[in-house]
């Protein structure tokens, strides 16, 4: 009996191509997440710097706002 070629080699090549494409998509997603994390980190640092500036200028007022007066 003669065996029939089912084209299994093509399926393997297609599977490898799909794996490479999936890895490329994962790498892109990872890079996008890294960029987003860096941006958020920069935003948080900016807000913290602004808070520090306000506290340096108005530290006494800031502390007074938290001191209870007359049993409040």
UniProtKB/Swiss-Prot annotation:
Q: Which Pfam families match?
A: Pup
State what this protein does: Protein modifier that is covalently attached to lysine residues of substrate proteins, thereby targeting them for proteasomal degradation. The tagging system is termed pupylation.
> Which superkingdom does the taxonomy of this entry point to?
Bacteria
Q: Which InterPro entries match?
A: Ubiquitin-like_Pup (IPR008515)
Question: Mind giving the lineage of the organism this protein is from?
Answer: Bacteria, Bacillati, Actinomycetota, Actinomycetes, Kitasatosporales
Q: Please list the GO biological process terms of this entry.
A: modification-dependent protein catabolic process; proteasomal protein catabolic process; protein pupylation
**Renumbered to this chain, where is the cross-link Isoglutamyl lysine isopeptide (Glu-Lys) (interchain with K-? in acceptor proteins)?**
72
Keyword check for Coiled coil:
yes
- Protein family (similarity comment): Belongs to the prokaryotic ubiquitin-like protein family.
Gene name per UniProt:
pup
Q: What is known of its domains?
A: The N-terminal unstructured half of Pup provides a signal required to initiate unfolding and degradation by the proteasome but is not needed for pupylation, while the C-terminal helical half of Pup interacts with ARC to target proteins to the proteasome.
Bias (Basic and acidic residues) occurs at 31-42
Keywords in alphabetical order: Coiled coil, Isopeptide bond, Ubl conjugation pathway
Task: Describe its partners and assembly state.
Answer: Strongly interacts with the proteasome-associated ATPase ARC through a hydrophobic interface; the interacting region of Pup lies in its C-terminal half. There is one Pup binding site per ARC hexamer ring.
Tell me the segments the record calls region Disordered: 1-45
Pathway(s) the chain acts in: Protein degradation; proteasomal Pup-dependent pathway
Coiled-coil features, chain-numbered ranges: 9-60
Q: Kindly list the GO molecular function terms attached to this UniProt entry.
A: proteasome binding; protein tag activity
Composition-biased stretches, type Gly residues, lie in 1-10
The annotated region (ARC ATPase binding) lies at 28-66
State what protein this is by name.
Answer: Prokaryotic ubiquitin-like protein Pup
